[in-house]
């Protein structure tokens, strides 16, 4: 996609993914590793787990017409689980439940960071809001990762990437 801004041309690649895309990429990483079936499930879930903080959208939709709407998605998505604190909790959980402890834990940490990276470069909403990633939360909120070149959530490369990941999952 090429955009013109102040007479300059910009080429942008969108890697923002839906939870389905995060799941597929995490599965591909886990499937290629020398780990047990159980550990593959843990790695795959670790790549999707950061989006747990997006579940607040259900409460927000159900209460939006009330006198006291719950703004759980607006306030907490990309905050509670898109940070190093959650990454460490995820790492400990994977070490506890995996059979090949450190190999599986490192793969889980890898897919967790792939998730964060992809959200970092492509989380812009249709209204132009760029979701920042509070990477050092809960230890510090001073460093918020965001990039002004983020693509919109519904951009065509997202669909293409998901289709490619689905093809790799099915055929490889």
Please place each PLM-identified region on the residue numbering.
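N-terminal membrane-targeting hydrophobic helices
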Residues: 1-172
């Amino acid at each position: 996609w090429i955009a013109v801004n102040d007479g300059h041309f910009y080429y942008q690649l969108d890697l923002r993914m839906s939870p389905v895309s995060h799941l597929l990429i995490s599965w591909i990483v886990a499937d290629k590793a020398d780990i047990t079936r159980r550990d593959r499930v843990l790695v795959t879930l670790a790549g999707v787990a950061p989006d747990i903080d997006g579940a607040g959208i259900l409460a927000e939709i159900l209460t939006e017409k009330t006198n006291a709407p719950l703004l759980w998605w607006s306030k907490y998505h990309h905050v509670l689980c898109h940070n190093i604190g959650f990454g460490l909790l995820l790492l400990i959980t994977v070490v506890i439940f995996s059979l090949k402890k450190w190999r599986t834990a490192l793969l889980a940490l890898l897919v967790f960071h792939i998730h964060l990276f992809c959200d970092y470069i492509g989380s812009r909403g249709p209204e132009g809001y760029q979701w920042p990633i509070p990477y050092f939360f809960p230890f510090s909120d001073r460093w918020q990762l965001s990039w002004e070149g983020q693509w919109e959530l519904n951009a065509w490369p997202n669909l293409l990437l998901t289709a490619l990941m689905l093809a790799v999952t099915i055929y490889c």
